Amino acid sequence: MHHFVPDFDTDDDYVNNHNSSLNHLPRKSITTMGEDDDLMELLWQNGQVVVQNQRLHTKKPSSSPPKLLPSMDPQQQPSSDQNLFIQEDEMTSWLHYPLRDDDFCSDLLFSAAPTATATATVSQVTAARPPVSSTNESRPPVRNFMNFSRLRGDFNNGRGGESGPLLSKAVVRESTQVSPSATPSAAASESGLTRRTDGTDSSAVAGGGAYNRKGKAVAMTAPAIEITGTSSSVVSKSEIEPEKTNVDDRKRKEREATTTDETESRSEETKQARVSTTSTKRSRAAEVHNLSERKRRDRINERMKALQELIPRCNKSDKASMLDEAIEYMKSLQLQIQMMSMGCGMMPMMYPGMQQYMPHMAMGMGMNQPIPPPSFMPFPNMLAAQRPLPTQTHMAGSGPQYPVHASDPSRVFVPNQQYDPTSGQPQYPAGYTDPYQQFRGLHPTQPPQFQNQATSYPSSSRVSSSKESEDHGNHTTG
């Protein structure tokens, strides 16, 4: 692949030369420029400027064919190409066409069409100059076009269209300056650097190239520039998007952290409130329970004191002993009630545990006074009916009856008379045994009718006995 070195210059010093060179063109060729196609090329042939349409790939025949320059490898440079030089007078600028404000991306993105290939001719070499030593050590290192980026302000502010013309002018001016002492290969190598103008990143086309009337650079090596432009746009967008993503992620993490802190604080407050409420309820329940227990114990103590007062001779302090005493006392009371409910004719039975309570029972019933035993038989009616008195029958038939005198007051039992309780059993007639002698101490007081009848019978019996003794004495004497 061979590169053609175009003859162009964009310095302001060569504006007059450009105007003078355009005057040599016929008017027909000038008027037809730009009518058929926007992309035109100006060639220098035999001291004349020739217009060539790049899309149609047509060029005017020339008397002398253009000389081709082989592509120069940066590692190897032929010595034959070092003798070729370009004079300043033979270079004419053709890039002074009016610029258009089109899409900014068109300056960086190109299609790999065959129309991007430019041709150039070198008219003549005037004089041979000494070769210029060019070594690999003196060359600046080629920069990596994949790492350059554009400012984010152009994308954010939408001013890409405004910076397009300025960037294109800067690119043309930086890339089209060729020193008279440099070879085309050296100029190409020096112009193949990435330069930054007015805060914007731009790339210079290596090896020179053709330019259209819009002021846009058409690269000689189209594939490399295409990769460069595409990478620049991709890198710039990828730089913007990660930053936005990082900002969003940071904000999202901050919101999540804030939400988490608020949730944790609320949960802690809720737990504390629940614990405090539960502890308060438990303390209140404990207080109520303690108060009820205290009241219940007080009532029990009062009842035990009252029971201790009711039980006689109860000196127990503990509750169990007091309850035992109360149980025994209730049993004794039950027995007393049974004895009182029985009739007078039925002798109550003596239980084993009644001896200790007998004095208390007598005091409660008014029986604390000793009861004197009667001096007569308790049932005189039955005895009188069973055994009639013989003296009365004998005296009834023998003579007039004598009136029964009243009994001797000294012989009648008087309640006010002092009675000796230490004396033995009452005196009964000889050969008579009392059948109720064993129950006399427990039997209640005798009915009053029995006493009256008993008081009359002994006197009559005693009177009759005295009469019998007198009659018996008289009968023996007479």
Curated annotation (Swiss-Prot):
Listed GO biological process terms: chlorophyll biosynthetic process; gibberellic acid mediated signaling pathway; gibberellin biosynthetic process; heme biosynthetic process; negative gravitropism; negative regulation of photomorphogenesis; negative regulation of seed germination; red light signaling pathway
Phylogenetic classification of the source organism: Eukaryota, Viridiplantae, Streptophyta, Embryophyta, Tracheophyta
Domain bHLH span(s) in chain numbering: 284-333
Chief localization: nucleus
SUPFAM superfamilies per record: HLH, helix-loop-helix DNA-binding domain (SSF47459)
Induction of expression: Repressed by red (R) and far red (FR) light treatments in a phyB- and phyA-dependent manner, and via a PTAC12/HMR/PAP5 regulated process. Down-regulated by abscisic acid (ABA) and auxin (IAA), but up-regulated by cold and heat. Follows a free-running tenous circadian rhythm, with slightly higher levels during in the light phase.
Cited function: Transcription activator. Negatively regulates chlorophyll biosynthesis and seed germination in the dark, and lightinduced degradation of PIF1 relieves this negative regulation to promote photomorphogenesis. Binds to the G-box motif (5'-CACGTG-3') found in many light-regulated promoters. Promotes the expression of SOM, and thus modulates responses to abscisic acid (ABA) and gibberellic acid (GA).
Full protein name: Transcription factor PIF1
Post-translational modification, as annotated: Phosphorylated at Thr-10, Thr-197, Ser-202, Ser-464, Ser-465, Ser-466 and Ser-469 by CK2. Phosphorylated and ubiquitinated after an exposure to light (especially red and far-red), in a phytochrome-dependent manner. Modified proteins undergo a proteasome-dependent degradation. Its stability and degradation plays a central role in photomorphogenesis of seedlings.
Site annotation Pfr PHYA binding: residues: L95, N144
Site (Pfr PHYB binding) location in chain: G47
Tissue/organ expression: Mainly expressed in leaves, stems and seedlings, and, to a lower extent, in fruits, flowers and roots.
A GO MF term: DNA binding
Effect the entry attributes to changing G160A: Reduced interaction with PHYA (Pfr form)
Entry keyword annotation includes Electron transport: no
Stored PROSITE patterns: BHLH
CDD domains: bHLH_AtPIF_like
Cellular localisation: Nucleus
Activity regulation information from UniProt: DNA-binding ability is inhibited by PCH1 and PCHL to negatively regulate the expressions of its target genes.
Mutagenesis / variant outcome for changing T197A: Loss of phosphorylation by CK2
Compositional bias per record (Polar residues), positions renumbered to this chain: 415-426
Result for mutant: S464A: Loss of phosphorylation by CK2
Assembly mode: Homodimer. Interacts with the photoactivated conformer (Pfr) of phytochromes A and B, PHYA and PHYB. Also interacts with APRR1/TOC1. Binds to RGL2, RGA and FHY3 (via N-terminus). Associates to PTAC12/HMR/PAP5 which acts as a transcriptional coactivator. Binds directly to PCH1 and PCHL; this interaction facilitates its association with phyB and its subsequent light-induced degradation.
